[in-house]
Amino acid sequence: MKTFGKKVVLIGDGSVGSSYAFAMVTQGVADEFVIIDIAKDKVKADVQDLNHGTVHSPSPVDVKAGEYEDCKDADLVVITAGAPQKPGETRLQLVEKNTKIMKSIVKSVMDSGFDGYFLIAANPVDILTRFVKEYTGLPAERVIGSGTVLDSARLQYLISQELGVAPSSVDASIIGEHGDTELAVWSQANVAGISVYDTLKEQTGSEAKAEEIYVNTRDAAYEIIQAKGSTYYGIALALMRISKAILNNENNVLNVSIQLDGQYGGHKGVYLGVPTLVNQHGAVKIYEMPLSAEEQALFDKSVKILEDTFDSIKYLLED
């Protein structure tokens, strides 16, 4: 690979993409930030708008409109482009149309001579990330999905509101599909080493509160989409967090979507959200959380759904 730097190319300047661009500029994560979209006038306007704010960025960043040839020397290509999720539509129902869009985008990126890392956010993210890995032949650690980073943040936030602590003080994870079969790992969720599940049960006298928090976490996107059309701030910040871990070589453990290789019950090939060490070499090490028998069964179900869905679009791997 080429020498590692901090050039990021964003493909997709919709609500998620533009929110991500704003987050990256305000955090000063990239040195060079290129935006690609078929809506060239919007890109031009967003670039102008963002550059006007770079004086307030914590470090210099050059924002520009670009084309696919700009991917040649990019360190990180982030793809948010795709058909949006409609009210009532599941992420998996998006699969065929967004896989076709993704294939076209990735072919153009690879044709540029790109030799960096992919970060995928378009839905269904686990399926599309696996598709990119298999279509390009890149090592799994260099093809990363946003996974359940956002879902885990939602869970942490809801728990924090119930327990009266800061979200950052909550150690809790959503793993599996970024979607309807995701699961909360209650057996490991804690605040200062104290079980969240047990605390909720003690406070309420029942197990219903934990289930309510899980359901509200799982279904948050549907509620937001129904009210305002799409989700973008939360996922944009999650993407910024992953990008920062890569570009700054932070060695952070994040629940990104990555390919399993025998972990969590011997599963191989499937991409889904699990705790993974992320640094300038990509998603380099999966951490295998101890799961209860019930949690393992739910995880296996998530794997099965994702495997079956991927099988339905495998034909698109052929040129």
Curated annotation (Swiss-Prot):
- What EC number(s) does this enzyme carry? 1.1.1.27
InterPro entries membership: L-lactate/malate_DH (IPR001557), L-lactate_DH (IPR011304), L-lactate_DH_AS (IPR018177), Lactate/malate_DH_C (IPR022383), Lactate/malate_DH_N (IPR001236), Lactate_DH/Glyco_Ohase_4_C (IPR015955), NAD(P)-bd_dom_sf (IPR036291)
The scientific name of the source species is Staphylococcus aureus (strain JH9)
What is this protein called in UniProt? Answer: L-lactate dehydrogenase 2
PROSITE patterns assigned: L_LDH
Please write the reaction equations for the catalytic activity of this protein. (S)-lactate + NAD(+) = pyruvate + NADH + H(+)
Entry's NCBIfam families? L-LDH-NAD, PRK00066.1
Amino-acid positions noted as binding substrate in the UniProt annotation, renumbered to this chain: 85, 91, 123-126, 151-154, 231
Q: Which residues form the active site?
A: 178 (proton acceptor)
Q: Which UniProt keywords apply?
A: Cytoplasm, NAD, Oxidoreductase, Phosphoprotein, Stress response
Which BP terms does GO give this entry? Answer: glycolytic process; lactate metabolic process
A GO-annotated cellular component? cytoplasm
